[in-house]
Amino acid sequence: MSAATEANGHHVGQSLRRKEDPRLITGRARYVDDIELPGMLWAAIVRSPEAHAKIVSIDTSAAAEREGVHAVYVGADMADLGGPLPCAWSPEGFNNPEHWPLARDTVKHVGDPVAVVIGDDRYAVVDAAEDVVVEYESLPVVTDPEQAIEGGPLVHEQFGTNKVFEWSLPGGDIEAGFAEADVIVERKFVNHRTAGAPIEPRGVLADYRAGALTVYSSTQVPHFLRLFLALLLGISEERVRVVAPEVGGGFGSKLQVYGEEILLAWCSRKLGQPVKWIETRTENMAVSHHGRDQISQIKIGAKQDGKITAYHVKILGDFGAYNMLLTPVIPVLGAFVMGGCYAIPAVQTDIVGVFTNKNPTDAIRGAGRPEATHMIEITLDQLAAELGIDRLELRRKNFIPRDSFPHATATAVTYDSGDYEKTLDKLLEHLDLEAFEREREELRAKGVYRGIGFSTYTEICGLAPSRITGPKGLGLAAGGWESAMVRVHNTGAVTVYTGTSPHGQGLETAFAQIVADKLGVDPANVEVIHGDTGTGPEGRNTYGSRSLAVGGEAIARSANKIAEKSKQVVAHHLEAAPEDIEVRDGKFSVKGSPDKGMTLAEVAGAVYIYDIPDGMEPGLEETTFYDPENFVFPFGAHACVVDVDAETGKVTVARYVAVDDCGNAINPLLISGQVHGGVVHGIGQALYERIHYDEDGQLVTGTFVDYALPTAAELPSFELDRTTTPSPVNSLGSKGVGEAGTIAASAAVTNAVIDALRPLGVTYMNMPLSPMRVWEAITQAKEGAPA
């Protein structure tokens, strides 16, 4: 048994170290860039320097004559492709332009691909790509979404508008709610554009031979990718295999069917050789999809005692130049939790998506929920100041009561479980607010302004119940189920095949813990296979904090089936009733007689030599396809303490405390790791990170010199705690946690900065809270300008 195992044999709930780490820290892990195949060629992609232009001509002759160059292709060469790149949702009135792996007539943003060069050597094809001469006829550019929607230059002329779609989620009587309000607060939020910036950029290696295609890709969605490779290339799906080897982070930016994946597969089939492309960091920042980029107008009404009566949000989403796999879905996810943790009787979200001449947006960690949480949490602080009510008391007054779960919200979803008072109470146990006020005064005398900000959040994850999101519900062209196959070998070793595709979360460890408890084995003897469509059943991949709540439940159900069959075998051998057999201390034993039992290895031995009850099929292998009945809704309360230098505007995060509730914990160590990473991501957006284009559509922040990511040097040690409110949706009682920190953090940081600067007259700010922006806010406040 593992050292962390309790006496009763339970591994779930223990902080086991990650099974994945030895191969990663010893350099034995294999990423796409580590894979080489005989006869492998390299690809370099020629990209547009123009944000919007007509392609007049492309001269590839000089590049094609380069030594070692095998081929140069342009969009016209791919006329045999079965269709454009996919978007999974097409609501009524949806404008969806064709989006091809290589642009055909016009380019719509800087970085749009126009040609690909294939050759023997990685660096030679990059040089050859510079010999491709493209003549462009520049067209008008629009990068401001408000200008785009108000009559700016058209990105796609065929639609006669830059509007992608309109979508509303009304709940309750919004007009009556505002009529009832004593106080109304209105604000404009700008949730700026960010990048996923994984440590490993994307990479693709395509190998077509003998009528079969294998694609190695740094992707979160190998099963989706296989489907669209088959459809677009006209290859029977069983002849297509997608492998996601080690994936060095994704954060949503690899939740995509990218043009490069289709392009390289097409090139490999055309040339009859493997073709590889590894994204540069510059390409990653320019053409891997971005996130956020919403401008929102909010209006909230409340009674004088603080009870909120109505909340209305109007979102203008900058989708960039094209709709990608889930582009229009992102603000919709936020709409489902727009009311946050609060019992607001009327909530309405109106969404307008708009095209601009920028890289497309799609899911980045949190995907709509950080934007929603940021708005409601900043707004509550603004409302509290307007009412003269303590901001925490305002939250408590409006929390959904703990005894009202499951709770049907005004935003068309039912929260599964929650206890928001409990997480806030535990958070305050970590904070000595009286001491904080003393420290605040001492620091202010030195010219340092200290503030504390709070963020109480809930999120929607465990995507997704197919009845809600699928064709019969929201209309997504995919079910939200997940699959798992559990196989017990002759020796009692266990292999798990999961349809979800981990990429850094530690799920090999968590899944092994679940199976270990179900079958009475050591997690070390449980191997988890993932990210390969050639093994195991069809799956739905990794996104939306779904891997544990949906994928883990599928695994648990398969393991339960094996456990039940094993109990019948043990009962047969021990002459006991199956219902009297339990899994305890590493074996299947008779209740009350722990000395009478069989290990899983002994059970497997009996099954495979066919010493089993009459009528039982041999084998210990079970498959489950699990479709949840509901989403799961993790929640928590975070606090951030910042120090602001009033002379320079520099913000320093002095302390960060987080209390999260993700239901029953499978591995607390993994939870802490996920919260750590998520909080850093949220702090990064609040203070440092920003994707910025100039008015000509040129990317200004295309490197890590310009796009500032936080490092350990900018951050304190985080203080983490948890409460436990099990979910009734799955048998594990668990919820997701991978995005929680990001969802809470930006609001906590922003509220802290505003709290610090309130004595100087600053009452409101939009992110990122850079030194220049903070200094300008202080200066304007001193001059009496409105915040």
List PLM regions with ranges.
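Glycine-rich loop/linker segments at domain edges
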Residues: 14, 20-23, 90-92, 162-204, ...
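Thiamine diphosphate
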Residues: 246, 250-272, 276-278, 507-515
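C-terminal catalytic domains of large/alpha subunits in multi-subunit enzymes
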Residues: 66, 75-76, 234-239, 269-275, ...
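Helix-loop-helix junctions that connect adjacent transmembrane helices in secondary transporters/permeases
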Residues: 152-233, 401-493, 700-714, 719-721
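Flexible, low-hydrophobicity surface segments
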Residues: 1-164, 184-187, 270, 759
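Extended active-site and interfacial segments that coordinate phosphate-rich ligands
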Residues: 19-23, 130-139, 222, 227, ...
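Short acidic, glycine/serine/threonine-rich loops at helix termini
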Residues: 82-87, 128-131, 226-228, 251-257, ...
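Conserved catalytic cysteine-centered active-site region
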Residues: 105-106, 236-244, 267-280, 284-285
